């Protein structure tokens, strides 16, 4: 019988390797210090005693002592789980090999082949496509309509500007999961919206906002706009209020229209400042777990997918593979591929953005 648990063996093995690496580094630092002391003695200079070494550590290297505990925490709770997750992708740790009942084996890249070319490819690539479409749509809509709303609220002559801003900011103050659960009840087949539409005889039956794949995807994007637009509006408002008025006044004197001013002055300035935030929002939307999980739960169900629904993103599919299906190796592969996609896009987008190029030039 298998007494040992493979996952515990792997965790303790990785922890031992990390401990050995830390010990080797400390030992190397000790040898380096001993060599330095020997050089001092051979040159006839004074060798510091224990009290002097302690004062040097307490004064000149005090930051090293402060960083010891946080560094241990990072190693145990960030580095170790990350390496453990990567290692699982190269095993057959799934529902057929549950720990501690059975031991899993190292299988190389077979899990990657299963996801990219095997039975999981029919789920992975459609979900990857929808994830990218969702990330682009969610980022673009909140950015565009947030700027439009900021311009409207900063229009000259508009009364009660602070009141309007406060009303829109309320959606930020409300916890996101509360808003999503309320919208889920509001949009379901027997919710208030469908009830109102049928009472007014605008529809013969309930509109499947959350139960039809296409309707559900549009509903998710719309609800995300409700949550994300106020944040973009606040950021854009701060940028607009600090734009140099000389350029705008000069453009108005030259006869430029409001659209021309927006196109040539306002929008480029907003885009320059918000470019890093836009990239961050795009990556965040790729891994936006809350909106999908609380609004549709990944549904409606799709019989052609493995452990996934029509609106699942890669991150929510990863969650289902881990919690429901117990396919930890496949979930690890999805996590690695998602990270590779996000990291590649981030590097390319950041290095090619105007904000990065201006900072590098300075």
Residue ranges and their predicted role:
Residues 1-20, 24-40, 62-362:
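A structural signal for multi-pass alpha-helical bundles of membrane permease subunits
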Residues 39-58:
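Membrane-interfacial, low-structure loops and terminal tails that flank and connect transmembrane helices
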């Amino acid at each position: 019988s298998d007494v040992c648990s493979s996952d515990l063996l792997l965790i303790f093995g990785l922890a031992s390797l990390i401990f050995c690496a830390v010990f080797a580094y400390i030992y190397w630092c000790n040898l380096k210090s001993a060599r330095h002391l020997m050089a001092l003695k051979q040159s006839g200079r004074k060798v510091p005693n224990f009290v002097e070494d302690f004062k040097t550590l307490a004064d000149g290297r005090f930051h090293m002592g402060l960083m010891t505990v946080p560094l241990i925490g990072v190693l145990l709770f960030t580095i170790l789980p990350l390496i453990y997750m990567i290692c699982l992708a190269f095993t057959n740790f799934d529902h057929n090999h549950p720990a501690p009942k059975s031991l899993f084996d190292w299988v190389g890249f077979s899990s990657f082949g299963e996801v990219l070319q095997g039975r999981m490819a029919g789920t992975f690539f459609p979900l990857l496509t929808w994830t990218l479409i969702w990330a682009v749509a969610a980022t673009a809509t909140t950015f565009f309509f947030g700027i439009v709303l900021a311009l409207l609220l900063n229009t000259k002559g508009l009364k009660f500007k602070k009141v309007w801003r406060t009303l829109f900011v309320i959606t930020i103050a409300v916890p996101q999961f509360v808003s999503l659960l309320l919208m889920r009840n509001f949009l379901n087949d027997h919710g208030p919206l469908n009830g109102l539409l049928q009472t007014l005889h605008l529809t013969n039956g309930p509109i499947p906002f959350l139960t039809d794949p296409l309707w559900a995807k549009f509903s998710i994007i719309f609800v995300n706009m409700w949550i994300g637009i106020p944040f973009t509006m606040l950021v854009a408002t701060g940028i607009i209020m600090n734009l140099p008025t000389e350029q705008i006044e000069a453009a108005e004197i030259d006869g430029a229209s409001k659209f021309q001013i927006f196109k040539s002055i306002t929008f480029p300035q907003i885009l320059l400042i918000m470019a890093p935030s836009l990239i961050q929002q795009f990556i965040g939307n790729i891994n936006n777990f809350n909106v999908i999980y609380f609004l549709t739960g990944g549904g409606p169900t799709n019989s052609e997918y493995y452990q996934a629904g029509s609106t699942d993103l890669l991150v929510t599919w990863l969650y289902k593979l881990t919690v429901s299906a117990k396919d930890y190796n496949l979930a690890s592969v999805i996590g690695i591929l998602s990270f590779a996609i996000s990291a590649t896009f981030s590097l390319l987008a950041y290095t090619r953005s105007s904000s990065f190029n201006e900072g590098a030039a300075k």
